[in-house]
Structures are given as structure tokens and as C-alpha cells.
Amino acid sequence: MLAGVLLLQSWLKANYPQVQFGSYGVQEGEFYLDFKVEKSFSIKEFEQLEQDLNAYFNQLNNVVQTKIDKTKSLKFFQADPFTTTLIESIESNSLVVTTVNEQTFWVHDLVLPLPKQGFVKLLNVSANYFLGDPTKPQLQRLVGIFAASKEQLKSLIAANEQKYQNDHRAIGKRLEIFTFDPLVGAGFPIWLEKGAVLKKIIGDFVHYQQLMFGFKTVSSPVLANLELYKISGHYVHYSEDMFPSVKLENQMMMLRPMTCPHHCLIFKHKRRSYKELPQRFCEDSILHRFEASGGLTGLERVRCMTLLDNHIFCRTDQIKAEIKNAFKLIQTVNNKFGFSFDRIDLALHDPNNKAKFIDNDQLWANSESQIESVFKELNVPYKIDVGAAAFYGPKIDFQFKTALNKMITIATIQLDFLLPERFELRYFDEQSNAQTPVIIHVGIVGTYERFIAALLEKTHGNLPLWMAPVQVVVIPVNIDKHEKAAKKLYQKLLKENIRVSLDESEDRLGKKVRTAIVNKIPLQIIVGDKEMQDLTRITCRGFKGEKVQKLYWANFVKKVRKDG
């Protein structure tokens, strides 16, 4: 795919000598290139541009890779500030550059030789801030597919189209789960009726499990005094990811980016005995984080989100039991939703890097050994990443691969030794001596937004009956003749607390059935002449083409209760 980057760079340089190049790379089988040029490209030009690029590939001659030192490369590319910035960020003093037709480019990962033929399919053009930073210049980004033959290109295009059909953004649009609107703002999702119902279904199940695993529900405001985040350290370290503060009655207030400081105050509001620990708090927290516009991705990466947040305040001797409890909670919930994690990462501290981590060897050794013993007892495979722990404690990440082959974190368990110190949290031991608790941050499913994105991609939108926003659709064969009976049945289903819709369109029966299939509604009830005469007999079918069933009313309700 990097041959596509080199081809595009070379063609741009030949046609627009003043072009400047930003980031490039390969993601999920596609290549992309950021660049600055006076010409603004549009999708309407793609067909001609593809022809030009395919023809130009045959003109790529004398492709040579050369190793040069960093100082020389910075001098060589000094006319291109974006390339020099990228080179400066490289730690190595030796770089590889690629020369084509006597023009040199920084495509350091390219593998030679190039194929004998080259074919390009362009997919998208967009505007992106350099390095995703809104304070930096905006560049154009072209995204495409490169192949060494027409047959390979055709195969890659088909695979790419299938991949995007399974993208949660496409599924969410087709099923009317969520939407975005520029009047609300980029990164601020709007939940449509079905999406709001799906959120509630997920929330109800998770909330019940939180209760069963000993968590207590609390609630805190979305706005807080800036001083709170200065105490927690979030403002110092993450202010660029937070929304700007606002002055209210001589106080600087800020939309919260996380809930842990609030839960610290809940723990602190009264004297705590060692007998009261652990304290487990949970909250559905609305959070705001100022993600760069270039990084926003459907529901996966947004600026406003609701986190099913959990915090455990415990003694150091309780760490193992609490992690085991949290681990089982995460497994219980995610198994119910059909998730098996592709990878579990255990991030540990590096004992040789004292500057990067809290300086308490005994605390690190104790907590990390307790975590590893949990993995061994549960016989769960995991990957150790030494040096990847947070400054304030070790972390467990539960990873899931999306339809676009991107690994995302769904659930987390994070130990925190720092926040209890910052907020001077204390409990009193058997001798009435003040001791500092440990905080364990637990993300069971993460945010509703990211979890639903992963759920839609995993199921392709085919949600099981118990999870479907609409479980049953009532379809009158003839709207004029059968509507009254269909409405009666619809009302009966509502009273049974079954999530039901009524198709009141004037479409023919075949189209109504197809609409239900497209909307992936698990059960369809057909109301015709026979059903109109006796509403105690139900004619139903599944959206996947199952045989039509005729059931008595009580048996149908029992079926929905059992499966839903």
C-alpha cells in the first residue's frame, strides 16, 4: 500500500512542484497522504485522477532508497516544514529516503522493488489538521487503495465495501440508531428513538449487575469548579483535552472530563472506618472531552459521552479480591452481550524508570503481584506490557477488534495510588491510625457510545430479541381493512411491556415485510382476514426468513418473554 503513497507523492510533485507533504501511512488496507497544495481536490475528479495516477505509475523510474543521517535529511527537506517536523520527532539518527525520477521523498517504510504494474482506487478526500492539532495548518488528505493488478484491485474494493457496510456508522444510519448534526456540533451524537431504547436496555442490565456485585449508585453534576481538576491533576496534565472553562459568579467552572474527582469527594464526605471498606460507587456520567476533529470517528470517538463509571475505594490487602470481583463483573456483562475479548493487556511499571512512575517500590510490587495472581487463578491468557502502566498505577485493558480491524479498549481495570493522596483520602484502621486507601477505576463496558459502536459491528445490527429496540412489528395486510384489528393487537402487546411498532403505511404486504427485514426487527406479526376474526391466534415470522408460525396469544407472549 505504501507504493500508493509514493505514487501519489511523485505525481503531486510532478504536477504541483510547490506541494508540501504531511503525514502518510496505511490503515486497514488503505493508504492515506496529507499534503498542502493550492489545488483543492474533490470526489468528482476521482475518476480522472485515478486514470492519471495509473498512467503515471509506468513513469516511475530509478526508484532508489538511501540511508542518510537526521541532520542531512532536515537540511534536505528544509523547504517543507511539515516533513521536517515529522523527521524531528523521529528518535533515530538514521533515516531512509526514497528517490524517484530524481525527486526525493520521505517514505521510509517502503519495500522495494515496486510491482511491475500499479492501480489505484481513490476512496475519500478530506481536510485534516497537521498532526490532528487544530492549532496547526489544515491539509488535504487523500485516501485510496493500491493494487498490483486489476484483479487484485477489484478484490480489495469488494472487501473494502463489505468492511464499510459493517462499520457501525453505516449500520447506525440504516437502523436509525443515532445521528449527528452540524447545528449541534462535530462529535456530539444525537440518539434517535431506537438508540435511546438500546442505551436503556444496556444500562438496565449493567445497573442490575452493578447492584449484584456490590456497587452503590451515586450522582454528581456535569459542571465543577476548576479547582477540583487542579487538585486531581487533570487540569495540569490534560487541559488540552478539556473544554474551555467559563466564569460564573467569579468562579471558574468546567465541564467534567471524568468523574473520579467527584467520587473522591463522596468518599471523603464523612469519616471512614476500615470495616466500611471496600466502598464501591457507580454512576452513568456525562463527560465532555475536546477530541481533535480529525480523530472523531462515529460513536467510537466523540466529544460528549456517557460513561458507565465505577470506582472502588479499598485497603491494599483487598486489591486482589476487588480485582477478581471486577474481572468477573466485566466477564458477566460482556458475555451476556456476546463479547469475547481479542486480547487482554496488563500494563506494569518499569522498575528501572523511577522518573515515570510513583516512587513506591513496595506498593507497585504488592499490587502487581496481586493482579497477576488473579490472572493465574482465573486461568485467563494475557499480554504483559512492562513500562505501559499509568504514572499512578498498573492497568488491565480488555481489547476488541472492530469491523475496520482497529483494536479498541472496551473495558478497563486501573489501580490508582495518586488520587487518594491528592485528595487526602483517609480511613482509620484497627488502632485508629489514619491510612490511605487505593482507588480501582473499573470500566465495565466503557461508554455507551463506544460500546454500542462495537455491538453494532459485532452483530452487524442483528440484535437478539432481548436487546432489539423494536422486538415486534405488527403488519396489517391491508391498511384500510385490517388496521383496526392491528391496532388492538399493538395495544395488547404494549400492555405486555413488549417493544412493538405498527406499520401503518399503505405499502403492499411484500414491501412491508422487506422493510421489517431491512430494519432487522426480530419478529413480524401479520394481521389479515383470519387474524382479524380471532386475535388470540398469532401469525408470526422472523426477519431472517424463518417459517411462518401460528401461535396462541399466551404462547407468543411466553416466547417473547423467554427469548427477550
UniProtKB/Swiss-Prot annotation:
This is Threonine--tRNA ligase. It catalyses: tRNA(Thr) + L-threonine + ATP = L-threonyl-tRNA(Thr) + AMP + diphosphate + H(+). GO terms for cellular component: cytoplasm. One of its GO terms (biological process) is threonyl-tRNA aminoacylation. It comes from Mycoplasma pneumoniae (strain ATCC 29342 / M129 / Subtype 1) (Mycoplasmoides pneumoniae). InterPro entries: aa-tRNA-synt_IIb (IPR002314), aa-tRNA-synth_II (IPR006195), aa-tRNA-synth_II/BPL/LPL (IPR045864), Anticodon-bd (IPR004154), Anticodon-bd_dom_sf (IPR036621), Thr-tRNA-ligase_IIa (IPR002320), Thr/Ala-tRNA-synth_IIc_edit (IPR018163), ThrRS_anticodon (IPR047246). Belongs to the class-II aminoacyl-tRNA synthetase family. GO terms for molecular function: ATP binding; metal ion binding; threonine-tRNA ligase activity; tRNA binding. Residues 167-464 are annotated as: Catalytic. Pfam families: HGTP_anticodon, tRNA-synt_2b. Its EC number is 6.1.1.3. The keyword tRNA-binding applies. Binds 1 zinc ion per subunit.
